[in-house]
């Protein structure tokens, strides 16, 4: 269920289940028009699965110490630029992840805090450019991982395909890449201290949030990150 953060806090005080995932949609750079469609897709996930309570937050300032104590995952959904949480809030988030929290970055999340390398180190890479936009093939390079289990060996999707400042293979385990002669990872996971980090570069257009392969990837990536069944 997606609800405003303040309402979720009231429900929590009333004894309702705590939110498991805080979905941040704040942008300080480019604002993706697909964010509402992506948020709606996560809403359906929360409605259809008893494993997730998903709470949307418009501002990263909502990631207070108290909010993080009650959360199992933080999702940066196409966030961009230097978010309002600032360096103090970022350090708090990084400590929480290293202590065992789950972090999921989707699409433009890799273009967040571009001047703060500690964020890119946690995520696995920093966005550089999107040299190809259109219908492309994604090759699933590891189908044994819980996030990709059940996906086909490859699939075609209309999307914006990223390349990164450094190859994420240096810091992460790559799960999928673009089908091209160059090595262009798109999906990966890594450990940050005791925390789990999952990232997918897919999700630029609205249509990506209706694509069954992308939806399965996001759901299973979140399940893995929070250690859900």
Predicted regions and their residues:
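Solvent-exposed, acidic/flexible segments
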Residues: 28-35, 83-90, 211
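Short alpha-beta junction capping motif
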Residues: 21-24, 68-113, 194
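Bacterial Sec-dependent signal peptides at the C-terminal "C-region" and cleavage site
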Residues: 3-20, 30
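An acidic, glycine-rich "communication" segment
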Residues: 106-181
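Extracellular ligand-binding/catalytic regions of CAZymes and related secreted enzymes
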Residues: 7, 18-19, 25, 33-36, ...
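Extracytoplasmic/secreted envelope proteins and their assembly/folding machinery
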Residues: 39-43, 90-94, 116
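A short beta-strand-loop structural module common to alpha/beta enzyme folds
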Residues: 51-61
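Solvent-exposed loop/turn segments at secondary-structure junctions
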Residues: 27-30, 60-62, 79-83, 103, ...
């Amino acid at each position: 269920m997606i609800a405003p953060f303040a309402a979720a806090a009231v429900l929590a005080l009333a004894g309702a289940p705590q939110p498991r995932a805080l979905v941040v949609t704040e942008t300080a750079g480019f604002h993706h028009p697909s964010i509402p469609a992506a948020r709606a897709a996560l809403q359906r996930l929360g409605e259809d699965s008893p494993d997730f309570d998903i709470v949307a937050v418009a501002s990263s300032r909502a990631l207070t110490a108290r909010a993080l104590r009650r959360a199992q995952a933080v999702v940066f959904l196409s966030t961009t630029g230097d978010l309002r949480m600032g360096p103090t809030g970022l350090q708090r988030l990084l400590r929480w992840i290293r202590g065992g929290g789950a972090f999921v970055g989707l699409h433009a999340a890799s273009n967040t805090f571009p001047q703060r390398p500690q964020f890119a180190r946690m995520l696995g890479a920093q966005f550089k450019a999107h040299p190809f936009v259109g219908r492309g093939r994604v090759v699933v390079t590891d189908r044994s991982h819980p996030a990709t289990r059940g996906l086909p060996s490859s699939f075609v999707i209309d999307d914006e395909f990223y390349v990164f400042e450094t190859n994420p293979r240096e810091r992460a385990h790559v799960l999928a890449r673009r089908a091209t002669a160059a090595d262009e990872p798109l999906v990966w996971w890594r450990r940050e201290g005791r925390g789990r980090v999952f990232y997918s570069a897919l999700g630029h257009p609205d249509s990506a949030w209706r694509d069954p392969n992308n939806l399965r990837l996001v759901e299973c990536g979140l399940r893995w990150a929070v250690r859900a069944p």
